[in-house]
Amino acid sequence: MAGTWLLLLLALGCPALPTGVGGTPFPSLAPPIMLLVDGKQQMVVVCLVLDVAPPGLDSPIWFSAGNGSALDAFTYGPSPATDGTWTNLAHLSLPSEELASWEPLVCHTGPGAEGHSRSTQPMHLSGEASTARTCPQEPLRGTPGGALWLGVLRLLLFKLLLFDLLLTCSCLCDPAGPLPSPATTTRLRALGSHRLHPATETGGREATSSPRPQPRDRRWGDTPPGRKPGSPVWGEGSYLSSYPTCPAQAWCSRSALRAPSSSLGAFFAGDLPPPLQAGAA
């Protein structure tokens, strides 16, 4: 897994490396990167060698500092390439405090340190340290225009959610719907008054509407409207004859024939006409 990551890093940093079948190895150094290891920053330098010897043959890779000392590196490979050649990879970790003592850094490859070898161009680590990429704690960078569009989108979404919330609350607070219009209210009132005072036809003519009920504080001497003393009870224009239906007249006649047996009955009988006389009938 680490070898694949390092190969990808080298492909991005050194896209112009020569490829193809050849008998001479070609080393190259990738741009260094900064890593945080155990709370300390270290610089990692990767060396990629193309066209190395096949497995079984000695093809070491090592680093050398400006003072002539050799530095051992961790080597991956060799691994086969797509064009039939072999590739080798090595990386070196250096403390960030000791970079000045190790520059310039050179990568070597070949049959050995005593024989003929191939080397890279010297790399100055102090200058590379300022431009090296830092993997951990790298701040995210974006254009101000992108941040502005993101803020506008968030504001629109917030307003949409707020409008939906207000609409839902208004529907829950008024489940009966809107009030009827004034014209509808007037028609309903007219229809209600018509039902309270219906007009029926009796004997081929329209009956008059019943009068308003009189208060019950009248005494025995009071006479209902439309009736004179000594006139027949069921005469034309009397109080009881104004009721349009026959059941009401029958109920009144039956109630009039019974005498009140108690004070409560006398109180309710005060609103009824006196008993029907035989001569008046």
UniProtKB/Swiss-Prot annotation:
Q: Which residues lie on this side of the membrane: Extracellular?
A: 24-146
What is the predominant subcellular site recorded for this chain? membrane
What clinical condition does the entry mention?
Immunodeficiency 126: An autosomal recessive immunologic disorder characterized by T-cell abnormalities with impaired development of alpha/beta T cells and increased susceptibility to recurrent infections. Disease severity is highly variable, ranging from life-threatening infections in infancy to severe infections, lymphoproliferation or autoimmunity beginning between the ages of 13 to 25 years. Some affected individuals may have very mild disease or be asymptomatic.
Q: Which keywords annotate this record?
A: Cell membrane, Disulfide bond, Glycoprotein, Membrane, Receptor, Signal, Transmembrane, Transmembrane helix
SS bond partners: C47-C107
Task: Explain the purpose of this protein.
Answer: Component of the pre-T-cell receptor complex (composed of PTCRA, TCRB and the CD3 complex) that has a crucial role in early T-cell development, particularly alpha-beta T cell differentiation.
Which residue intervals make up region (Disordered)? 196-233
Q: Name one GO cellular component term.
A: plasma membrane
Mutation effect (R189Q): Does not affect expression of pre-T-cell receptor complex at the cell surface
Q: From the Swiss-Prot or TrEMBL record, give the protein name.
A: Pre T-cell antigen receptor alpha
Membrane topology listed for this record: Single-pass type I membrane protein
InterPro entries xref list: Ig-like_dom_sf, Ig-like_fold, PTCRA
- Write out the topological domains of type Cytoplasmic: 168-281
